[in-house]
Regions:
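The feature captures the conserved acid-bearing segment of alpha/beta-hydrolase catalytic domains
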Residues: 177-240
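Primarily recognizes the serine-hydrolase "nucleophile elbow" in alpha/beta-hydrolase
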Residues: 129-202
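Alpha/beta-hydrolase active-site loop
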Residues: 106-147, 260-263
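N-terminal cap/lid segment of alpha/beta-hydrolase-fold proteins
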Residues: 1-53
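Short amphipathic alpha-helix adjacent to the substrate-entry channel of hydrolases
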Residues: 73-93, 227
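Active-site glycine-rich loops that stabilize anionic/oxyanionic intermediates
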Residues: 64-69, 212-213
Length: 272
């Protein structure tokens, strides 16, 4: 049984007050995974630690991907959170605002990307700043309620996948220091719509993982992030796997990319 979701805002989310979409969760054969769509009221779902370990007293917010049209809620959400909780972290799965659609938003996205790619990209770019604002508010909320969650407000991390990685980057580059995480892990993230040429001073350490055969060509985004963070003198680590495709998350493919979360934990442990 999962914990009850925590709403990020007291009322309607700022900037989308008129949205009336109904959140849905269903299995899509197109992506072969469980997805959540039509999020208009963003929430955090706490996943408390299930054992003591290196993450004791630390929080990690997990942002699933899905092209800003859906959230891969298991492989890039709760499966990640459960793994982190098993080594002591207090994890939170973030449901951020998404493009509003009909009964099967994933099918609508796949069709639009086939027939009108520019329109699909425009839809994503339009909602991305709202999703980023939700990521910022999630960090603020966890810090504000740190005592309640038994976490250190100076040890709040953020892991995001694909579009969720874009959210993670927006949070990492926030102009509000109170909304910036203490460490960040954009996994096969897209940098679309974000100026990463000059990372803000005080940005926390970054962990990157991507597959060289990423079907969306996002390897170059991770390489650019690595180079930009290095040039700025910021701590960064990049794992570029030969195979894994896009969206590997916690899927078992019997490839080295399956172990990305172990490498993340190794990296985190070395932060001290």
């Amino acid at each position: 049984m999962r914990a009850a979701p925590i709403h990020l805002y007291d009322g309607p989310a700022p900037g989308s007050e008129g949205w009336t979409g109904v959140e849905r969760q269903y299995f899509t054969e197109l992506w072969d995974t469980e997805v959540v769509t039509n999020v208009s009221a963003p929430t955090l779902v706490p996943v408390p630690p299930t054992a003591a370990g290196q993450g004791d007293g630390q929080a990690v917010i997990v942002a699933p991907g899905g092209g800003f049209h859906g959230l891969s809620i298991d492989s890039e959400g709760f499966a990640v959170a459960d793994r982190l909780a098993a080594v002591g972290f207090t994890a939170f799965v973030l449901k951020y605002r998404l493009v509003q659609g009909g009964d099967d938003t994933v099918a609508e996205l796949v069709e639009t990307m086939t027939t009108d790619l520019e329109r699909a990209l425009d839809d994503m770019i339009a909602v991305a700043p709202l999703a980023g604002a939700d990521g910022e508010e999630a960090v603020r909320l966890v810090r504000r309620r740190a005592e309640e969650f038994s976490v250190d407000p100076s040890k709040v991390g953020f892991v995001g996948f694909s579009a969720g990685g874009n959210v993670a980057l927006r949070v990492a580059c926030s102009s509000d220091a109170a909304a910036r995480p203490d460490f960040v892990a954009p996994i096969y993230a897209t940098t679309r719509g974000i100026d990463v040429r000059e990372p803000p001073a005080g940005t926390g350490p970054m962990f990157l993982a991507v597959a060289t055969d990423d079907s969306l060509g996002l390897t170059r985004d991770s390489v650019e992030l690595y180079q930009r963070w290095r040039a700025a003198g910021l701590p960064v680590e990049l794992h570029a796997y030969a195979r894994g495709g896009h969206g590997f998350g916690m899927r078992v493919q019997h490839l080295p990319s399956d172990t990305w979360i172990d490498r993340f934990l190794d990296w985190h442990a070395a932060l001290g």
